[in-house]
Amino acid sequence: LYIFSLFFIFSACQNNTQYSHDQLDSKFGVYISKLSNQEVSGHLSNGLIPIALKDNIDAIGFANTAGSIALKQNFPDKNAFLVQKLIDKGFFIRGKTNLSEWANFRSTSSTSGWSSLGGQTLNPYGLNRNPCGSSSGSAVAVALAMVEVAIGTETNGSISCPSSVNGIVGIKPTVGLVSRSGIIPIS
């Protein structure tokens, strides 16, 4: 099963108003790549809604790396089906979130939330706690209120686990409800 999810803000785990997005990203390892503050301001002034994507989903202007150095130059020529639908509805991509490299398909003993490109994503409730699951960067972005909505993927706990340990709600639509084109899959 390979399922998509929207992570909705449930409650921010910390009062982060004194920190910039860049400071939060630096501390918690949320993004692999992101728009500049100037680009974000332009989109916001046009009334668009920011969204974060797990870095295994195609989005024009961003490399789709699955967190791996091997795919660092993998720039798609079109958006994933899901991404295009979101853009058509008034969203813009704020950035690509860190993930467990290859969506945790490296080893049965690999570390959740670690990739060679993004380093280690940290759990905002406890820096020594597991951020849990390959969609951990997306979950942490929502938990820190860096975005209100983020997209993740799941084969085996990659949405449910980071949602539960980062204090947010993860929704998994029925398999087949949303096209999986433009996604680097593990199943």
Regions found by a protein language model. Name each.
Residues L1-L6:
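Sec-dependent signal peptide recognition
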Residues F7, D25, A143-L144:
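Alpha-helix termination/capping residues and helix-transition junctions
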Residues C13-F75, N79-A80, N98-N104:
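Short, well-ordered alpha-helical
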Residues A80, I87-S187:
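Short glycine/serine-rich loop segments
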